[in-house]
Amino acid sequence: TGKLLFPKEAVLDWINKDSIITGKGQLTITGSHDPLLEAVLRQTSIDIATMWNGSSAGLERVASGKASAAVIHIFCPAFRSWNIEPVKTTCADKDVVLLHWAKRSRGLVMKPFVALHVSSLSAIRPYRLSQRQKGAGAQILFEHLLDEASIRTEQLELTATCHTELESVLALLEGKADIAFGLEHYATKYN
């Protein structure tokens, strides 16, 4: 599930003053690529910069003061929960607010001929698989699911390393991969 991470002071200022978040320099949203947020931002007249660099990198940028907000969806296997523990750890001394933004529907996105042969995660081994960059929420979750299925990444043919949800699915259309761990939104859009 995706979350947006904002500095608490900025949220309270926005609520109390009925204004947009302001601060030093450019308002920047970083972290996980979120197609819904991207569409919403395109419809606004607010000057907001985006940097889709993955959940973990986005969280680090907020913690270091280099970003105004981060879109994150980081599964924490030890707690079987999303986002809270990584935020507590990374932003322990920061004044931040964690807001629920949206739920993501994700799974294996496959070329049609592959879908005929893959009915479980264990059946992906012979196929080329696009992957997300280290620290991306999707990659963290996928590696957890592989671990639960007793599959090591060394057993897979990993091809393209993709930096956005869209890139991950486009790798299939471009012939770089047969399977991606991606969003239902893009699977439906590019089917």
Predicted regions and their residues:
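Short, intrinsically disordered, charge-balanced linker/junction segments flanking boundaries
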Residues: 1, 123, 187-191
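N-terminal hydrophobic or amphipathic helices and topogenic motifs
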Residues: 1-66, 82-85, 89-96, 115-118, ...
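Short, well-ordered beta-strand segments
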Residues: 28-31, 130, 180
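Ligand-binding cleft/hinge of the Venus flytrap
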Residues: 39-45, 121, 132, 138-160
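Short helices/loops that flank or line small-molecule/ion binding pockets
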Residues: 56-68, 74-75, 161-176
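A ligand-binding cleft/hinge motif common to bilobed small-molecule-binding domains
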Residues: 73-89, 169-191
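Short Pro/Gly-enriched coil loops immediately N-terminal to beta-strands
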Residues: 90-109, 124-125
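Flexible hinge/capping segments at coil-to-helix
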Residues: 110-129
